[in-house]
Swiss-Prot record:
One of its GO terms (cellular component) is membrane. This is Nucleoside diphosphate kinase, mitochondrial. It catalyses: a 2'-deoxyribonucleoside 5'-diphosphate + ATP = a 2'-deoxyribonucleoside 5'-triphosphate + ADP; a ribonucleoside 5'-diphosphate + ATP = a ribonucleoside 5'-triphosphate + ADP. It is found in: Mitochondrion intermembrane space; Mitochondrion matrix. It comes from Columba livia. It holds the Pfam family NDK. Gene3D superfamilies: Nucleoside diphosphate kinase-like domain.
Amino acid sequence: MFRGGTHRLRGQPGLSLPHGPRCYGSAPPELQEKTLVLVKPDAVQRRLVGNVIQRFERRGFKLVAMKLLQADQGLLDKHYQQLRQKPFYPALLAYMTSGPLVAMVWEGYNVVRSTRAMVGDTDSAVAAAGTIRGDFSMHVSRNVVHASDSVETAQREIGFWFQRNELVAWESGDRDYTWGP
């Protein structure tokens, strides 16, 4: 178990991860958070969904909800409410409705901040190698994934994309090995 400081992803210079235990998904319930991750239409078309899922599973996070859907304008207007007045919003809306996307809820210790580190900078030109965007994104307007930026935002966004009964509470078998009985 890792405690304190930041550490590097294997083979990924410069990518620091937050403080805390190394096996993030297996923390006791009182230490768990949830976050929303959207695999955007460009990544679905390029068949990158499995690559994204694999990165979260390798970090020990637990998938508690997932669905493939064609997002409509109403849902995206709620999700991107803070961007609706921006000049690029019509292009963002066209992009996000251009094909199916995958919405997922991941659970684990410090999952929001860890996910932001894993996803990388919004601008693919500056996203670090080893991050999802650094490895797969080709342009700032086609940046592969969305990830909630705070615990509060995650709670709100999860409510837009999922009904409460769509989140599956299940016990991860690796908790005892990581945290003890």
